[in-house]
């Protein structure tokens, strides 16, 4: 934040450390997810759930994890692999969407989740995002430079930011305008 304040659920959070924001129900999917050797994807998600006070019996957890992995077409063996270690770019993005679906945050920020994805992975990630929207009444903030992923989603609002400033807000029709005319018209307004 370069200026102003960030409020979430009636609480100012711009001074809160990231882990406390996560405990409040925020989720951030990174553009370039890091590899964490020694911690499996499954244990990472289960630990994050427990930190949020969600304690599932092991068999119930495994069943929910498997069902969610099936939605995202992720092989079950990935649950026992080190977090993001040796994952392709698309597999890392799917793993992040898996975490979002399992943690069910009230506010999720997806930072270029579509970056580097092939057509099939983009469809799978879009399906995961729509699944989040169906089962959660929270908010989703998608940062992207490519409108392809947005075309597969139900978009309520579209915002354009240039150099950290919000320059345009509209409904989903703004996506069509961007596809037809690009971003340049908004950049020169700055």
Positions of the model-derived regions?
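Q-loop/switch helix immediately C-terminal to the Walker
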Residues: 32, 38-52, 64
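ABC ATPase C-loop
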Residues: 100-101
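Walker B motif beta-strand of ABC-family P-loop ATPases
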Residues: 106-112
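ABC ATPase NBD Q-loop/coupling interface
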Residues: 5-21, 84
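Hydrophobic anchor residue at the start of the ABC signature
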Residues: 96-97
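Conserved catalytic loops of ABC-family nucleotide-binding domains
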Residues: 128-145, 150-152
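Conserved beta-strand-loop-alpha-helix hinge in the C-terminal portion
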Residues: 157, 161, 165-188
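Walker B catalytic motif
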Residues: 112-113, 120
């Amino acid at each position: 934040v370069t200026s102003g304040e960030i409020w979430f659920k009636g609480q100012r959070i711009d001074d809160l450390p990231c882990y406390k924001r996560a405990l409040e129900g925020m989720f951030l999917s990174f553009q370039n997810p890091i590899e964490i050797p020694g911690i499996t994807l499954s244990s990472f998600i289960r630990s994050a759930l427990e930190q949020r006070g969600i304690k599932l019996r092991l068999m119930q957890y495994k069943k929910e994890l498997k069902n969610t992995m099936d939605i995202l077409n992720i092989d079950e063996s990935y649950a026992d692999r080190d977090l993001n270690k040796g994952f392709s770019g698309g597999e890392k993005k799917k793993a992040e969407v898996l975490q979002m679906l399992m943690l069910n945050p009230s506010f999720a920020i997806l930072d270029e989740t579509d970056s580097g994805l092939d057509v099939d992975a983009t469809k799978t990630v879009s399906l995961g995002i729509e699944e989040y929207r169906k089962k959660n009444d929270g908010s989703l903030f998608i940062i992207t430079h490519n409108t392809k992923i947005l075309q597969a989603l139900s978009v309520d609002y579209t915002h354009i930011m240039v150099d950290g400033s919000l320059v345009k807000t509209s409904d989903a029709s703004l996506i069509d305008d961007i596809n037809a005319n690009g971003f340049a018209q908004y950049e020169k307004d700055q």
